[in-house]
């Protein structure tokens, strides 16, 4: 816990905010909030009306019932924000914090965060993070190149980094190995140059493009 000032409020250094007597780096909290905001805004249909469940929704509404947060080695599962019908940053998956900085975020398999929408460009603000597991969610769009700025993440260790089983579209940033983006549903992705919409760029696209050019030239002469 933190020292109390004369007004009875916990003191945090500049750039940090106080939550339940602990200090958290504002930028880390802001990135977590963006994950949540993007999920609420995505409007993804998970069939919750047909198959109602306390854990059906994006983000997973059941996360509001508890928190899985480790702060300097102390495990907390009952922060004051629980059970207010809104998923908040410290309720998102399993988190590890040290000295007010987010060191690990596990929101993948067996956590069931059910996140959706785009991965925020601001993910690079998680400058101290070492573990980033976001597999088995509903993320779409592209993986931002800014993810490669996470200098403390071992991208080649699947226990430290995994984005598999999402709906993220290639090409993926060069820093990400193939096994971290396996089993991706790319059925809704569109590719520049994929003229016939078959999910591949090949000789058929070239033939179609040539024919389109020739047709345009013929029509301009006729």
Where in this protein do the model-derived segments appear?
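N-terminal capping/linker segments that flank leucine-rich repeat
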Residues: 1-115, 119, 164-199
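Solvent-exposed, polar/charged alpha-helical surfaces in well-ordered, non-transmembrane soluble domains
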Residues: 30-33, 37, 121, 145, ...
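Sec-exported extracytoplasmic/periplasmic mature domains
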Residues: 37-40, 152, 211-218
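Short loop/beta submotifs within extracellular cysteine-rich repeat domains
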Residues: 43, 141, 216-220
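Conserved hydrophobic position(s) of the canonical leucine-rich repeat
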Residues: 102, 129, 140, 150-159
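Conserved hydrophobic beta-strand positions in leucine-rich repeat
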Residues: 105-108, 130-134, 156-163
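The feature encodes a structural signal of leucine-rich repeats
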Residues: 116-124, 140-148, 171-174
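Cellulosome-associated attachment modules in secreted, modular CAZymes
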Residues: 187-222
């Amino acid at each position: 816990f933190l020292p109390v000032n004369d007004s009875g409020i916990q003191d945090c250094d500049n750039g940090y905010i106080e939550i339940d007597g602990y200090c958290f780096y504002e930028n880390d909290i802001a990135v977590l909030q963006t994950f949540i905001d993007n999920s609420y805004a995505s409007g993804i249909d998970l069939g919750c009306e047909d198959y109602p469940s306390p854990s059906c929704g994006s983000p997973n509404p059941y996360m509001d019932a508890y928190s899985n947060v480790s702060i300097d080695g102390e495990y907390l599962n009952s922060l004051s924000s629980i059970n207010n019908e809104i998923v908040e940053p410290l309720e998102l998956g399993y988190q590890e914090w040290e000295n007010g900085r987010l060191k690990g975020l596990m929101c993948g398999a067996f956590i069931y965060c059910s996140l959706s929408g785009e991965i925020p460009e601001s993910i690079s603000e998680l400058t101290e993070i070492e573990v980033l597991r976001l597999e088995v969610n509903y993320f779409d769009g592209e993986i931002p190149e800014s993810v490669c700025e996470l200098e403390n993440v071992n991208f080649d260790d699947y226990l430290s980094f995994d984005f598999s089983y999402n709906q993220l579209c290639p090409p993926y940033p060069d820093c990400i190995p193939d096994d971290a983006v396996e089993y991706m549903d790319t059925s809704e992705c569109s590719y520049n140059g994929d003229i016939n919409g078959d999910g591949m760029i090949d000789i058929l696209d070239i033939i179609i493009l040539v024919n389109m050019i020739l047709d345009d030239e013929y029509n301009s002469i006729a």
